[in-house]
Amino acid sequence: MNIEEVTAAGVEILHLLQDYHRPPAHREMLIDPILYAFMKGRFGAVTRQHHVSVYGSQKPKRIDFRVGGTNPSVMELAVRSPLGSGSLLGGPNTSELRKLCKVSTTQAKLRVLLLIDLYTNHYTKGDLQASYDVVHAGPGKFKRCPVRVVYVHMNNRFNFCWSPYK
């Protein structure tokens, strides 16, 4: 899985949701099964709720998706509803970024936070990236890896790299 394929998956989900008169798009957990089915059909070796150990945590954290194969990837999903909210900004996604950046390179070569925006107005790359620049990976001695943030809206799509070393 690469960035172009993740972006294409996000765009396809937006198109699939438009086929519904009343789309199931008000919460992330209603879009999650649609994305899982799409990815399972496209990539095959997809697992949900992949466990990752986090320093200082009693039990492992869960990441939404892991795509296996010779170039494994992990992905978290965040959705902004048609009613709007700040759920795609950096602050609300701190825990997702921290989980993703702690996945070792043996478990995943690519770490992606997929942001699907269903609101009428879209974010600009500068505004969204600025909200992620202030987020850090947290304290502790552990290896941190960068995370690719992929934003998908019907009228705008872009991606940028979030560095855990800011």
Q: Can you describe what each PLM-predicted range is?
A:
Residues P82-S104:
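Mg2+/Mn2+-dependent nuclease catalytic core
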Residues H26, L30, I34, P60, ...:
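Short, well-structured alpha-helical interface segments that form or flank functional binding sites
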Residues R22, G84-S87, H122-Y123:
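A generic structural signal for short coil/turn motifs at secondary-structure boundaries
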Residues A45-V74:
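Active-site metal-binding core of divalent-cation-utilizing nuclease and nuclease-like domains
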Residues Q107-L110:
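A short helix->loop->beta-strand "cap" motif at the edges of active sites that frequently abuts
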Residues V112-K166:
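Domain-level recognition of nuclease-like catalytic cores that cleave nucleotide substrates
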Residues F65-G84, L100:
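Conserved catalytic cores of phosphodiester-cleaving nucleases, focusing on short active-site segments
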Residues N2-V52:
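Acidic-basic catalytic patches of nuclease active cores, encompassing PD-(D/E)XK
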